[in-house]
Regions:
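Residues that define the transmembrane beta-barrel architecture of outer-membrane proteins
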Residues: 27-31, 91-95, 143-147, 154, ...
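Solvent-exposed loop segments that connect transmembrane elements
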Residues: 1-23, 59-90, 124-137, 174-189, ...
Length: 361
């Protein structure tokens, strides 16, 4: 029982219903003006550039009422003294650009370098147990500076792309699980500043007229540079998270697929496809106030092996396939909720078979 109910001597039976009702809304208005272009510096060298102006307007309303006549509380239900009737808004504008150089070093081969600015607009955490004191503050905009150099190759049989990149993000917007008030929610927060660096390679190779190989590999290191302690947490109880991993950022991912087309004389082709996909381990939540990750939030690495066989018609405009997903029947989770027992398990976490139809117009 809440203190108010106690003062009245009101008892709470096991089957009593204690509830509250929340009415909430959010409105997001965005408009932008952008343009890009290419200027030929020479026959082999080009300057690429672009500019974008963005205007965001975000507003919310929230009204929550405790429905119990005695103001009693329950799991996820705050007392009547914390009923809300709040509204707020935030406006944000941004000017971001991109500039780069492309140079053709030989026929079908190009090297390039680019600098790009990124922007993600502001927002609010509006949910059932909204607390105006903390949640009424807007989530600030996220801005980034990205650098990339790379190499591209294109011929009749091979397409190859290689890139090295580094991105500095300020005001990184991240989801953080909050299990206060007896119920877990996902709270968006400006976690701080992060850096992402890595290298990527992908290719498509026509090994024969009938066999095509497609693959890629990415090594990425995403780390927290500076962490912003939540406003509701005492600064003395909040430790430095510098150097720790950014959630949902596996260090290594790679894939390889093969497809073989067998032509027939009956107006359709038969195809066989197989793929192998690997995803490294990753954390699904930000580190806690102690600067340590919850061990349960570490999602193990996993491998996916898929296969399919089918028929294609009219130059692959239509396909009918028998599919097999997760042939190794390897279970995995994609998200941890932060409450020590709840994970999000995707459909592909179990082996299954089916029929698929695809059409292109």
């Amino acid at each position: 029982l809440g203190a108010y109910a106690d003062s009245l001597g009101v008892s709470c039976n096991a089957n009593d219903i204690v509830s509250a009702t929340a009415y909430m809304s959010t409105e997001f208005n965005n408009w932008a003006l952008y343009g890009d272009g290419t200027y030929d510096l020479s026959d082999d060298m080009r300057l690429i550039f672009g500019l974008r102006y963005t205007d965001d307007e975000v507003s919310y309303t929230h009204r929550r009422v405790n429905n119990d006549e005695y103001g009693r509380t329950g799991v996820g239900v705050r007392p009547a003294t914390l009923d809300t009737d709040a509204a707020g808004s935030v406006d944000e504008t941004n000017l971001s650009g991109r500039v780069g150089i492309q140079y053709d070093i030989a026929k079908g081969q190009m090297i390039y370098g680019t600098y790009s600015q990124g922007y993600k607009g502001p927002g609010f955490n509006v949910y059932y147990n909204f607390n105006p004191e903390n949640d009424g503050r807007p989530i600030g905009a996220e801005e980034s500076d990205a650098y990339e150099i790379g190499y591209k190759y294109a011929s009749r049989d091979l397409l190859l792309n290689v890139a090295v990149f580094s991105t500095d993000i300020e005001g990184f917007q991240a989801n953080n699980f909050d299990c206060s008030d007896g119920a877990c929610i996902t709270r968006l927060t400006n976690a701080g500043n992060v850096t992402t660096q890595g290298v990527e390679l992908d290719f498509m190779y026509n090994a024969t007229d009938n066999l095509t190989l497609i693959g890629g590999v990415a090594y990425t290191k995403a780390e927290i540079d500076e962490f912003n302690c939540p406003a509701e947490v005492d600064a003395d109880a909040c430790t430095d998270r510098s150097g720790l991993d950014v959630p949902f950022s596996p260090d290594l991912k790679y894939s390889l697929s093969a497809e073989y087309i067998m032509e027939t004389e009956y107006g359709f082709d038969i195809y066989y496809n197989a793929s192998y996909i690997y995803t490294d381990e990753q954390y699904s939540d930000l580190p806690g106030n102690t600067g340590e990750f919850n061990a349960a939030s570490l999602l193990p690495d996993y491998t996916m092996v898929n296969a399919s066989v089918g028929m294609s018609f009219k130059d692959d405009a239509f396909r009918v396939s028998l599919i097999a997903k997760n042939l190794l029947d390897e279970s995995y989770a994609t998200t941890y909720s932060g409450d020590n027992f709840r994970y999000q398990i995707p459909r592909d976490a179990d082996r299954y078979f089916g029929v698929a139809f695809k059409a292109q117009f």
